[in-house]
Amino acid sequence: KADHQDGEEEDPQAFIRDYMDAVNEYRKTFPAKEDVVSQIPDPAVREMLLRMEQLGIDTAFDRFDQQKPQCNFGLAGICCKICNMGPCRITAKAPKGVCGADADLIVARNLLRSAAAGAAQHGMHAREVMLALKWAAEGRLDVPILGEQKIRSTAEAFGIKQKNRQLKNVARDLADVLLEDLSRTVPDEYKTISACAAQERREVWETLDILPVSAYHEVFEAYHKSGCATDGDWKSIMQQFLRCGLAFTFSGVVGASIATDSLFGVGDRVTSKVNIGALEKGYVNIYLRRHPVSYRSEEHTSEL
């Protein structure tokens, strides 16, 4: 394999061979639909796939097979479509894109934009349940607040005043803190990180200069830094990748979980009917799939 060192001149042909070897090894892990059907451990899913095939209904597995062979440049992460001068791809003949970006920078930009998309998608789910908690506390949403224990313990960790205060007022302040961490524009303390992350981890993140401002800000900054002629240092791009990761974790995951448990109560273990057998013949079966699921009144749906 080519020894790819940042900042050193290298044989373009050796580099191309290196990543093409990696792509070819990666391709070997791609299952065909027949592999999925034969190896899947769930008999109900196997039966469903076979039945769908009989009915002529295509699935993700059919469409995956139809896409083969996938683009070599896309699989290697060295295709750039960010500006209108492209798309560009890295080859031995063209080791840099039109803007001058090399393979390292193109891969870093693509990774960063994927991380920013994930932070935005989970962040919007988090926003829904944070707003639901806030509006339930303010009486704008007709939903009971069931997670008193979670609210009390989290408020203590966040330094929110509780003495002689009603639960709804504490819950509102907690929701405001979570929403502020999600959407802050002026750099300040990311309170969810301060309250929920281990001290030694926070010190490492501060040393690395990757503590986020807010989830919203880091998504903005990710698209800004990865634009054409903005930041040409792949290491700086990957530093922003880590900031997006922390914002994703502490707003999109931790913040969303706090708001969900505060509104609906901490979950208990239950026995449920699952899989295809949970569907009732002769009924309209409604399938809810969101993480988290926010139940809200029709009056406020458009506002969310």
Q: Where are the regions that the model predicts?
A:
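Metallocofactor- and cofactor-centric catalytic cores in central/energy metabolism, strongly enriched
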Residues: 11-302
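N-terminal low-complexity segments that are often proline-rich with Ser/Thr-Pro
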Residues: 2-8, 300, 304
